[in-house]
Amino acid sequence: MIEPLLCGIVLGLVPITLLGLFVSAWNQYRRGSGMLDMD
């Protein structure tokens, strides 16, 4: 059985991790070809 604490930690960390990866990928994209296209 899954412990409530472990379940809460996973549910808390997963969205933060996905958000962090998305933001870092978006920043790298903007820093790369995205900036050239905007200019």
From Swiss-Prot:
Main location: membrane
Transmembrane segments annotated in the record for this chain: 5-25
Protein name: Cytochrome b6-f complex subunit 5
Xref: InterPro entries: Cyt_6/f_cplx_su5, Cyt_6/f_cplx_su5_sf
GO cellular component term of the entry, any: plasma membrane-derived thylakoid membrane
Family classification: Belongs to the PetG family.
GO BP term, pick one: cytochrome complex assembly
Ranges in coiled-coil conformation: none
An MF annotation (GO) of this entry: electron transporter, transferring electrons within cytochrome b6/f complex of photosystem II activity
